[in-house]
Amino acid sequence: EVHPNGIAIDKLGNIFFSDSGGSKLYKIGRDRVITAIAGTGDFNDSGDGGLALNAGLRSPGGLAIGPDEALYVAEQTTHRIRKIDSNGIITSYVGNGIFGYAGDGGPAVKANIKNPFRMKFDKVGNLYFSDRDNNRIRKVDVNGVITTIAGHSNIGWLQDGLEVRITVHNFP
């Protein structure tokens, strides 16, 4: 049973989607043929530095195509965002796998995040993502440094007129 979650389309028109229940990523080519591109189907966190097809994925969700044409996947239950390059190699890009909030001003790959959900790159190459269970929007700049853009730990609702770092978010 397939549970489609995230979706992304590259500049060639290939469609990528995550199967959160099956712990895999798929590509639908322009010829409409579906091919698995990442994940063994096992619900585990493994394979960094190796082929994405041999890697374990846990709850893959949001997807984004980076300016480098790599595919980025938010793994909600491993608290990471991983990158799959054009050679099919998977590496951690954001998050150290520790459930929590820490790391602003330092390397994104060493930061604690909680349940990354959706993400988007800007024109310059900065990555913005919802750090959902931390109630924050965070940014990874082109140098790999993570910062918080909006939100804080208290659960609440958006409030018009407040500076974004003060405004409370409830699972962005």
Predicted regions and their residues:
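Beta-strand-rich domains and repeat architectures in extracellular enzymes and scaffolds
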Residues: 1-11, 17-19
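Short loop/turn segments immediately following the C-termini of beta-strands
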Residues: 20-21, 76, 132
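A short loop-to-beta-strand structural motif that recurs across blades of beta-propeller domains
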Residues: 23-27, 33, 79-83, 89, ...
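Conserved beta-propeller blade signature
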Residues: 14-16, 70-72, 126-129
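Gly/Pro-rich loop segments of beta-rich domains
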Residues: 1-5, 33-59, 89-115, 145-172
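Residue-level detector of Asp-centered blade-edge/turn motifs that repeat once per structural unit
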Residues: 9-12, 65-68, 121-124
